[in-house]
Amino acid sequence: MTEISSMVISHKKAKIEEMESAWHGDLDGLLNNLYHHEYVYECVVLKTCNRVEIYVVSPKSSSVLFSFAKEMGASTHIIDFYGHDESLEHLLRLAGGLESMIVGEDQILGQIKDLYAYSKKAGTTGKILDTAFEKAIQVGKRIRNETRINKGSVSIGSAAVDLAEDIFGGLTGKSVLVIGAGEIGVLVAKALAEKDIEAIYIANRTFKKAEEIAYELGGYAVRLDDIRGHLPDADVVISGTGAPHYILTREMIEEALDGRERKLLLIDIANPRDIEESVAELENVELCNIDNLRVISERTLKMRKEEAKKAEAIIQEEIRLLNIQYKRQKADRLISELYRQVYDVRVREREKAVNRLSAYHTIGEIETEVLDDLTHSIVNKILAEPTKVLRQAAELGNEEFLDVVSRVFCLEKDKAKLEKINQAKFEQIEPGCAKEQAAVKEQTAVKEQAVVKEQAAVKD
């Protein structure tokens, strides 16, 4: 049976360097290599900083994916191999943000959209993967609309920015000084740059690093020794250097407050602390440290875990609907082919009738139209009940019944494989491979002749 299978290398089992070593070449190369495998009918590749995932539609999924894992040089201990049902559930969980390092993050949904669109444009997807990925994107949106799984701050850096917004009622027109251009400092600066602030100043021990970040964000670089001169103009100071001593002392803050009446918010995200604790005693100063931010972050994580339960319920509901959709698609394929065959007979027999009548009488447009309507109506009425029965059987999962109908009426004779050989593979073989093209043509002709003989035998 041709279904979806997948292999997943993610942050859950693999280190960053292991994921990087498993990824060779560009996306085009991997997609092309996958799609031109004899037993791969459709494929999509998802590649982000935290995962490499391959989805294929194949009648020999296990052997195909194991061979690709070996080809990629990836150790099987860092890979999860999923069958059809597991692949669908994983994909929907991924789109919903449940598989991310930070539960509920939004970036993954955009990445799925972009990478699916890339594969679709490359021509490596078909009805089965299109249905799965379109459903995943829809579910990702639904989860974010119906739950609060992506709300609140879960990192210390984002919590610092949210806290500043809460205290001031927004950061519009505020001047912010960020001290420290390490990982957290950069994240804070980037989050601040998205706000409508008046100015952002980046101070760092290595001035060149401060200049690079400031240039990227449209801010101003400050030497660490010069921060004293910038404190009087700052509304918010966020410090996270990790230095073994205080960066901001009480004496420095008192000097900055001289002649000033507006509030100064100090947020210390360093460990050990960058700001002397006694500054909290000063008027018009509010000091928050990493412990305050951790409480906000943990509260958000707890909330997101609760929201994840709601997301799980949505996913289970959508998987049920997706399986019904796949079952209907199988019935629709059979019904479409059945109608096509019967309509071919209808057209041929109608033409015979018109020719016979024309031998004895003059047949005009009205008579021809009556015959056309008559045969059309007969076909539709004969097939109405079988159509209903086929759809019901599909929704009930009665695969055996569908297979019997398919064999009796010769509706599916390895159709997907013939189409793949005939269209995709032949058309995409590189120029100059005349022998390969001839071989494909010969294989296709042999198989098509076998199909015609099979149809003729059944009709006889």
Curated annotation (Swiss-Prot):
Family annotation (PANTHER family): GLUTAMYL-TRNA REDUCTASE
Name of the gene this protein is made from: hemA
Name of the molecule in the record: Glutamyl-tRNA reductase
The EC number(s) this enzyme carries: 1.2.1.70
NCBIfam families to which the protein is assigned, alphabetical: hemA (TIGR01035)
Binding locations of substrate: T48, C49, N50, R51, S100, E105, D106, Q107, Q111
Entry comment, domain topic: Possesses an unusual extended V-shaped dimeric structure with each monomer consisting of three distinct domains arranged along a curved 'spinal' alpha-helix. The N-terminal catalytic domain specifically recognizes the glutamate moiety of the substrate. The second domain is the NADPH-binding domain, and the third C-terminal domain is responsible for dimerization.
Lineage: Archaea, Methanobacteriati, Methanobacteriota, Stenosarchaea group, Methanomicrobia
Similarity comment: family membership: Belongs to the glutamyl-tRNA reductase family.
Known function: Catalyzes the NADPH-dependent reduction of glutamyl-tRNA(Glu) to glutamate 1-semialdehyde (GSA).
Important for activity, annotated site positions: H90
Pfam families: GlutR_dimer, GlutR_N, Shikimate_DH
CDD domains membership: NAD_bind_Glutamyl_tRNA_reduct (cd05213)
Keyword RNA-binding: no
